[in-house]
Amino acid sequence: MTDHSSTPTGSVSGRRLLLTGGAGFIGSHLTERLAADNEIVILDTLRRNALVSAGLDKHPHVKLIQGDVLDPAVVRQSMEGCDAIIHLASIAGVDTVLKNPVLTMRVSLLGTMNVLEAAAAKGGVKRLIDFSTSEVFGRYAYNVTEWDATTLGAVGEARWTYAVAKLATEHLAMNYWKQYQLPACSIRPFNIYGPRQVGEGAVHHFIVRALRGEPVQVHNDGSQIRAWCYVDDIVDGILLALEREQAVGHAFNIGNPRSTLTIYSLAKEIIRLASSSSHIEHVPWKQADVELRIPNIDKAKELLAFQPLIDLEEGLLRTIYWYRRHLDAP
């Protein structure tokens, strides 16, 4: 198995970091990597909480504040003493976005404004990482670079409220750097999966159904193509962006273009690796969807020395192992 302990990210130590949305899937993995050598403050509504299953909720270096980035006073309080901010808080998951388009935009737009305003006013922040999305590239994104034009869907399609709000936060982060010298950068994650991905996501749904012997439901014919990135790899990318001066003022695609598969093939692979008796069931999906999404990560390689390490089979096996131990646990 690939070991991330020897990657360049081990240099992050002796810091006090604020993670907004830090109790979520990716935030819990960041906390797990950072908590031994740093103080971590997590601001989260706890709508979803992956910290408990990771055993991090009682960690002596982790301070959890239950609150909302929409509350400027709570944001300012959470930021006290912190010299780095990783802003992950958002409404996550396509199904949730479709049901809550206004809240999706409020949390991304107003929440990010609150974080940027507080950080700029506070001073002493050495790095702010804004979490964006690969959805800014729209429905067709093949080998896309950070210099390619972003593409959004039609107004009125609720799915794109997430993407348009995230694209706006990228512009905000870049211009807080240019206008106020707040050292910010943005991360565009491409289809992250792994243990503790509770709630939504194709890998989550497919593994849960496969382990229960239920039909694995694929939208339409399953020909949609994705590049899948294991969570440990994006944690590497985030921590490199935290440490490297070259990151400031840039957006970065973080993903694994080597692990590319159709949704249908992903479902088949999960059924195989889980030794499941499940079959694939095609279900209609009439909402907007992304047909093709594969990143070009040359910029992250050049400026951050980022390199994804976990291939798809290894990542899926690790994830299935975690779900076997935690599925239906109290």
Identify the role of each PLM range:
Residues G10, A210-P330:
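C-terminal substrate-binding subdomain of Rossmann-fold SDR/epimerase-dehydratase oxidoreductases
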Residues V97, F190-N191, A251-I254:
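Short-chain dehydrogenase/reductase
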Residues Y140-A149, L167, H171-L242, P257-R258, ...:
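NAD(P)-dependent short-chain dehydrogenase/reductase
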